[in-house]
């Protein structure tokens, strides 16, 4: 839904929504979540008729909970890579994309909008960058990339109870990194790393 003030202006909502893609971006300043997908129908308060979206009346705006507009606590996070897992303190950025490859039945003759959805083979890709260091975990990460050996990766966003999000991938195949020397410290950029999983 999408509500605006005053309540007499056009409000909008979608029905039958399905998530096609989730993108999680992390860097030293902020974390962001981006959701993309399709919906069966867009309804609005200006042209709503009973029965649209299976509703008899346009939905009222939900009551807002208390919000003090303060900064979300626990911005600091952790990243663990490898087997056995080792904590990395040199991550500068990460971009994780989960794509469901949804197929909508919307190409049949005479059908107005998607009739249903079918999930495809999920794709999970990871891009990340770390500062180069002369230590065993960093060397092992490079060796895993060179040998195309799957490794576990875990990202924890936040460090306070009630304000945390974790993303765990059991088998990520790292690509050989690009050496980025645009700054004073050398960064290794791993792009297009694929997470492996089970198909059922």
Predicted regions and their residues:
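Signature of extracytoplasmic/envelope-associated structural regions
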Residues: 1-200
